[in-house]
Amino acid sequence: MSLRPCFVSLIDESDKPILIYVPNEAENEMNDVLKYNVLSNISLDYFESALVEWHSLDSKPLLKSIFQLEGVSVFAMLIKQTGLKIVIGFEQKSLSGADDEFEAINQIFETVRKIYIRVKCNPLLVSGDEKSIIKSLERKFDELFISTEVEL
């Protein structure tokens, strides 16, 4: 079974979106793209909520299922050291609730986090040039989510 995200959002420590990536954006309806932007915005409330515990005893970031809305299950991870927020949505009908599924979702988050770190720390990119960082992130996400499917 393949697991493919509907969207991937990277949000900085000041709650400014770095990138809201939608695989095959040209093929998606504009309403879907707008829906994913709204879901990313809604997720910010969960990061600020006192009801959601974002840290654990170990230093590993916690992955949380934060809400389901409009047929999309939204998961999030907060990297405390940098304030980076990663939000990824999956179609609810593609999720089975199997035990290994959460581990596969966690692996997708780790891959996204590593891609972000590699792009951000790339010495060939000018650190203040956000457009080149975004283009590089989009290209890497296209390679990950469009050219191959993530297998469970």
From Swiss-Prot:
SUPFAM superfamilies found in the cross-reference section: SNARE-like (SSF64356)
Keyword Cell membrane: no
GO biological process: early endosome to Golgi transport; endoplasmic reticulum to Golgi vesicle-mediated transport; intra-Golgi vesicle-mediated transport; protein-containing complex assembly; retrograde transport, endosome to Golgi
Quaternary organization: Interacts with the TRAPP II complex; TRAPP II subunits TRS33 and TRS65 are required for this interaction.
Organism: Saccharomyces cerevisiae (strain ATCC 204508 / S288c)
Principal location: Golgi
Keyword Acyltransferase: no
Physiological role: Required, together with the TRAPP II subunit TRS33, for TRAPP II complex assembly or stability, and for proper Golgi localization of TRAPP and the Rab GTPase YPT31.
Coiled coil: none
Pfam families assigned: Sedlin_N
Name of this chain's protein: TRAPP-associated protein TCA17
Top-level taxon of the source organism: Eukaryota
